Structures are given as structure tokens and as C-alpha cells.
């Protein structure tokens, strides 16, 4: 089977095998209860086919003043220990070649510059550092380097959860008051994203503070074990603020059918993280591009089968919930 015809699961499997060869085994071994519940909920959602009167499908969208070919983006990602020196840039190139963007988490200046040099659309997500001057420094750097948007992980206000048990980085990260966050948002000309929103209340607060977008996210289970699963939190959030800012989502999405369900529930775009890391390990930037292309192809097929010509046409009217599938 050629690389071009590889499925999403085959790309990820090849990535795992390549990581094993360098001594990295059992990548992403633990799945938090909130992510398991999110998976069960996604698997309980089915779509209604509408096969007569076929439509030509367009998966493109406008986001952060960009025309993207796909609503599938790379969630905020940081350099992992086993990545090569070009790993971050390779992900960025793969995302750009697939017609999408990359969000960056913690990166050093060299990695950041390498990503920028690929020409990929870049979103810089900063951490809620207790030393707020570092926040401003990173925002200024993002602006000067041509990022298309910036943002902050509010779900790290109280540190990072490692392996579901160990809390770390509480000395480095800390909660930002609403006044502090409002000031931070006001200091950048770029669209500001609040990442880690899991309630309508926080979504409304983000809007009031001047955010242009939010990411409904549990940080790949790196924040809380039992927070509301992102897909279950999404409808109330969309109902509350969906017509006023861009609502994005991530955490536990695996394929184009998952993306379709996220869009049907009101998200404008869907982020992937773990799968992209595996695709990078499989075939470098080409693996990332192949992964995003395959996910987008899956999405396009379901759109065609449900009579949805473009992304705005996807809504909950094509979704049927089958609760017994969650048992």
C-alpha cells in the first residue's frame, strides 16, 4: 500500500512503530475519564444520510482572516523530547501543505523561528505565566513574527495534570484575574483565543473580555480528569456565544466522522494533537499532510452523503443520538 493511500489508522500505527524503534513505547497510554466519556459520546452520534440530489462539497472556511482548505487544525503543540530538531517545522509544513494552520504551545525561539520560516499560518498560544511580563514578551514576539492569532491556555491556571495524578508547574503558571486578562487581550492587535473553555459561563466571560475565539478543550486530558467532556460542553457554549465569536474544539477527535459531528454541534473547526504527533513519526511533514488530507477526505464523503454542500450546512438536524451505545 502506498503512503498516499494510507488510512488514518495506518498512518498512526506506522508512527507508533517508528517511535518504538527509538525506545518510545506506549505513547499516550492513559486516557482520562473525561476523554473516555467524550469518545463514548462521539460514538453514540450517528448521521442521517440524504443521498438523493447530490451536492458538490466544499470543505473550506475563513478563519482568522485566512482561507483554509479544511476545518481540521493542529491543536497547540509543544516540542516533545523525542522529536527531531526539525520536528516542529515539519508539522507546520505538513499542516500548510494540507491547507491548514498550526497552533504552538511552549517553544524556544529557534523552534518558533523555524516554524515561521515554513510560511505556515501560525497561532501562538501562551501559558498563564505568573511572571506576566513573559506573557507580554511572547505576544509581542508573535506579532512581530507574523502570527495570525494569539491566545492563552486558561485550563493551566492551576498547573498541569501529569498522568492523571501528578500536579506540576503551579509555581510557573497561575490564574489571571479578569482585569489582568482583559489587559493582556487589549495589548495585541491580533485575534485572541481563550483555550480551555468548558462551560457557557467561561465562554461568556471570554467574550466579555474581548476574545475573538475560544477552544473548547481539556488539553488532551492534561488538565482535569472529570471535567465535562468537550463534545458535551459544546452545545451550550455554541448556544450562548456561537454567533458572536469563533468556537473551536479539540480533545479526543480521531477521524473525519468525528470532525463532522463536532461541526454539526456548532464548532467552526476541530483540532488534532496526538494523531499529528504520530503522523510526524510516521513520515515527517509528508505524514502530517497525508493525515490531514485523509481526515478531510473522510469529512467530505460524509458531507456528500448527508447533503451538506459546505461547512455552514452541517448542523444537528443530520445527527441522531443513540444513548445505549454509551453503555
Question: Residue locations for each model-derived region?
Answer:
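A gly/proline- and charged-residue-enriched helix-loop-helix capping module
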Residues: 96-133
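Active-site cofactor/substrate anionic-group-binding motifs, chiefly glycine-
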Residues: 63-107
Amino acid at each position: 500500500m502506498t503512503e498516499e493511500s494510507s488510512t488514518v489508522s495506518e498512518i498512526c500505527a506506522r508512527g507508533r512503530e517508528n517511535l518504538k524503534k527509538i525506545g518510545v513505547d506506549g505513547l499516550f497510554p492513559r486516557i482520562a475519564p473525561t476523554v473516555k466519556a467524550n469518545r463514548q459520546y462521539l460514538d453514540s452520534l450517528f448521521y442521517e444520510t440524504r443521498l438523493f440530489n447530490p451536492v458538490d462539497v466544499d470543505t473550506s472556511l475563513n478563519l482568522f482572516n485566512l482561507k483554509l482548505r479544511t476545518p481540521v487544525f493542529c491543536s497547540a503543540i509543544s516540542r516533545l523530547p523525542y522529536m527531531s530538531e526539525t520536528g516542529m517545522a515539519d508539522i507546520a509544513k505538513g499542516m500548510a501543505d494540507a491547507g491548514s494552520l498550526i497552533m504552538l504551545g511552549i517553544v524556544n525561539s529557534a523552534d518558533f523561528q523555524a516554524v515561521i520560516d515554513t510560511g505556515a499560518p501560525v497561532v501562538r498560544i501562551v501559558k498563564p505565566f505568573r511572571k506576566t511580563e513573559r506573557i507580554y514578551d511572547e505576544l509581542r514576539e508573535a506579532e512581530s513574527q507574523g502570527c495570525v492569532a494569539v491566545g492563552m491556555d486558561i485550563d493551566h491556571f492551576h498547573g498541569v495534570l501529569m498522568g492523571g495524578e501528578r500536579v506540576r508547574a503551579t509555581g510557573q503558571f497561575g490564574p489571571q484575574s479578569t482585569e489582568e486578562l482583559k489587559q493582556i487581550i487589549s495589548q495585541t492587535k491580533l485575534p485572541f483565543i481563550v483555550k480551555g473553555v468548558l462551560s457557557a459561563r467561561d465562554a461568556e466571560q471570554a467574550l466579555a473580555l474581548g476574545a475573538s475565539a475560544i477552544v473548547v478543550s481539556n488539553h488532551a486530558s492534561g488538565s482535569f480528569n472529570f471535567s465535562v467532556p468537550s463534545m458535551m460542553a459544546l452545545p451550550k457554549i455554541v448556544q450562548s456565544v456561537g454567533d458572536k465569536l469563533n468556537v473551536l474544539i479539540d480533545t479526543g477527535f480521531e477521524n473525519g466522522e468525528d470532525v463532522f459531528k463536532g461541526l454539526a454541534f456548532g464548532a467552526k473547526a476541530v483540532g488534532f494533537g496526538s494523531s499529528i504527533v504520530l503522523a510526524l513519526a510516521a513520515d515527517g511533514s509528508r505524514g502530517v499532510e497525508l493525515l490531514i488530507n485523509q481526515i478531510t477526505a473522510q469529512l467530505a464523503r460524509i458531507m456528500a452523503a448527508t447533503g451538506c454542500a459546505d461547512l455552514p450546512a452541517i448542523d444537528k438536524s443530520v445527527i441522531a443520538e443513540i444513548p445505549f451505545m454509551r453503555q
